[in-house]
UniProtKB/Swiss-Prot annotation:
GO terms for cellular component: cytosol. Keywords: Cytoplasm, RNA-binding. This is SsrA-binding protein. The lineage of its organism: Bacteria, Pseudomonadati, Pseudomonadota, Gammaproteobacteria, Pseudomonadales. HAMAP family: SmpB (MF_00023). Residues 131-160 are annotated as: Disordered.
Length: 160
């Protein structure tokens, strides 16, 4: 009997900038329509989601601005475009919810992460509302105070 291959686990890429620039309202899991060389590159971890977003048009969702670097060995016979638009696979009711929400002022749809789910590559997208500059400062202050509290707790535990 053939040995079963282990499925890769975990995150491939994250968009930390989106977490900094937006309030995340709702998250969705979407499949990706990829070509073979893209899957091989993602297996090697060669992807970036910084400045990527989701474009909703004609009843479909498209991932724009993501960068998947082609491997030199995998894409020899194909002209690989690292920043091509990739189709996101969502259910109709999820697409309807996204379309309705994005029509409201201030809402956007952004990609948060790419990850493996068994042998499939999934993209976590979010319905998000843009942060103002003062919101970003408030978030940073709260994060700093949490760090100080954790540091104090750790140092108190070491003294005992």
């Amino acid at each position: 009997m053939a040995k079963q291959k282990k499925h890769p686990q975990g995150n491939i890429a994250q968009n930390k900038k989106a977490l900094h620039d937006y309030f995340i309202e709702q998250k969705f899991e979407a499949g990706l329509a990829l070509s073979g060389w893209e899957v091989k590159s993602l297996r090697a971890g060669k992807a970036q989601l910084v400045d990527s977003y989701v474009l909703l048009k004609d009843g479909e969702a498209w991932l724009m601005g993501s960068h998947i670097t082609p491997l030199k060995t995998a894409s020899t016979h194909v002209i690989a475009d690292p920043t091509r638009t990739r189709k996101l696979l969502l259910h109709k009711r999820e697409l309807g919810r996204l379309f309705g929400s994005v029509q409201q002022k201030g809402y956007a749809c952004v990609a948060l992460s790419l990850y493996w789910k068994k042998h499939l590559i999934k993209c976590e997208i979010a319905l998000a509302k843009g942060k103002k500059e003062y919101d970003k400062r408030d978030t940073e202050k709260a994060r700093d105070s949490d760090r100080e509290i954790q540091r104090a707790i750790r140092s108190k535990g070491k003294e005992d």
